[in-house]
């Protein structure tokens, strides 16, 4: 059972998205320099589709849902991502502190962040980071059967580009 203890709408966790970030508790990763150690505890309210529906309704204008954590129960994250995709037009992101899972089903995710936080390497906006931020891309494999396959494109550079541009005051998103 997944629990969460807080939410916030952000503009920087997922590039070019207005994101409702849901902080999942019970994190098993325990990064030594974690800035959210309170999320290690098994606290908060149960996160299930009816709760998620209420959170979405209360946050008009969002374009993306980000599950911040959830490494204690990847199947629950997957099931919630499936619910979001089947019931809304929102994009779905998972911020995981674990390395990329080889058998992670991708069909309900638009973005996936992987890797534990290591202070000496920095976060996503550091060129030395061990963390990676992927956009899940879809490509038609066979036109007649309309078989889609998914692959990951590393877009970590967007966080680094934004940091540099903000430092010099000249940022424009490539997609705009």
For each feature predicted by the language model, list its residue ranges.
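Cysteine-centered iron-sulfur cluster-binding motifs in ferredoxin-type domains/subunits
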Residues: 21-34, 71
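Generic structural signal for beta-strand residues in well-ordered domains
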Residues: 13-15, 24, 58, 85, ...
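Short, flexible active-site-adjacent loop segments at beta-strand->alpha-helix junctions, enriched
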Residues: 28, 71, 98, 115-118, ...
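Surface-exposed, flexible loop/turn segments at secondary-structure boundaries
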Residues: 12, 73, 100, 120, ...
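Classical nucleotidyltransferase
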Residues: 103-176
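N-terminal [4Fe-4S]-dependent radical SAM core
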Residues: 1-23, 36-41, 156-159, 167-176
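Conserved Radical SAM active-site core
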Residues: 2-9, 18-19, 36-93, 98-105
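Short glycine/serine/threonine-biased micro-segments
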Residues: 24, 67-68, 113
């Amino acid at each position: 059972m997944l629990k969460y203890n807080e939410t916030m709408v952000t503009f920087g966790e997922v590039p070019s998205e207005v994101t409702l970030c849901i902080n999942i508790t019970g994190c098993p990763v325990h990064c030594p320099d974690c800035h959210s150690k309170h999320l290690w505890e098994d606290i908060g309210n149960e996160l299930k589709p009816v709760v998620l529906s209420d959170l979405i309704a209360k946050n008009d204008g969002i374009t993306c849902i980000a599950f911040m954590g959830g490494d204690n129960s990847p199947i629950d994250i997957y099931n919630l991502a499936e619910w979001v995709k089947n019931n809304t037009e929102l994009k779905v992101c998972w911020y995981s502190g674990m390395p990329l899972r080889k058998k992670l089903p991708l069909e309900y995710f638009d973005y996936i962040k992987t890797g534990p936080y290591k202070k000496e390497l920095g976060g996503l906006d550091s060129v030395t980071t061990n963390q990676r931020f992927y956009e899940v891309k879809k490509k038609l494999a066979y036109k007649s059967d309309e078989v889609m396959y998914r692959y990951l494109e590393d877009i970590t550079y967007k966080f680094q580009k934004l940091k540099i541009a903000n430092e010099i005051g000249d940022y424009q998103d490539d997609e705009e």
